[in-house]
Every structure is written in structure tokens, then in C-alpha cells.
Amino acid sequence: MLAPVCAVLAAGLLGVAEAAPAPCVNQEIVLEAKPLEMDYRNNNAVLRDVVITQCGVRIQADEARITGGLDFENSHWTISGDVRITAEGGSLSSDKAIVAFRNKLISAATITGAPAQFEQQREDGTTARGHANTIEYQTTSGTVSFNNNAWLSYGRNEITGQQLVYNIRSQSVQGMTKPGAARGDGRVRIVIQPDKPPQITTPGQEKEKKP
């Protein structure tokens, strides 16, 4: 299990009030795609121009290779080519991802790329952006885990580390590390840029600006 190495940052830095979404129970999955190969004996398939939607989650990619069947009961889809996943105001993009389905629900997505990218428009008007070698998105918890060379920014501030976990509902971030990691491997670096001081002009300067 992952162990936290620093507490969730103060609400004034990153957090806002968390709004829990309605539970995704018995919600239909809508699949749009062009079938290329259908192997009914081995329960595998290859699809093109794939779009999957459920409970506000939208997944699209150029291609999907499916193991475990099209019933979404317990299957894994390897999607590739212009991968884009949108959910709860956030978006993930990469060249490749593995999407897991459990009990006819979109359960999780593991996104890999060079690097995998994340973006969310925050409630305070700033945009959170992040990237890492691997990003894991969990639909039930609303968490986005950045693994290996993780970087996250919001406004003019940024956080870096080997592992970061961002909650897209509470819009808060937590640094994480693995048990047994070498000392210093779990450190996070937070850079907070100061606000720019207001520009002060004298009455004489104002007059000079007038024609």
C-alpha cells in the first residue's frame, strides 16, 4: 500500500469543498465503434474509432483491443492512438491506456505516454495541469495518481515528486511514496510563486500619460 509522506495541503493552497457526485449504479454503458476483428471463441475483439460513455466518463481512442469480452462484466481494454478520457471536469490524454471494467462499470484507467497528461479547470479559476510516466484514474474515489516523474501545477505554483495523488473532486493533492523506497525518493518539491505587487503610480506619472 502507498503511505502518505505529507498531509493534504491546506485549503488555501489547493483544496476546495468536496462535492460528492451521485453514485454510478446500474448506469448504462454506451459504446460506439467500428468492429475490425471479433474472436467469439476466445472472447476477444479489436475495434476502431472507439467512444465509451458512462456516468459522465467519456473515453475515446483510435483503437481498442479487448480481452474478457464485450459484456463489461470483468474485462480489460487496451486502447491506443489519440487517447482522451474526460470525467468530472478533468481530462487525461496519452498514446495508450488500459481501461478496466468491473460489474458493468468503468472501474479504472491506467494511462501511459511520453508523458501522460492531465488537465482540470478548477473552481478558483486556475487550471490544474500535470504529467507523469504513468497516470492511474480511479472512478469510484475520483483520484488521479501520477507515478514516476510526476509534475502538477495550478496557477503559478507547482509540485513535483515521484508520486502524487490528486483528487479531482476536492481539488487537493497529496505526496505519496512506496514502502521500502530509498530515503529521499518520496520527497516532494512545492514551489509557490508570490503574488505580483500592485503597480503604484504618482499623480505626476498619471498626468504624463494623458495626451
Tell me what each language-model feature is.
Residues 1-211:
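Mature-chain termini and adjacent capping regions
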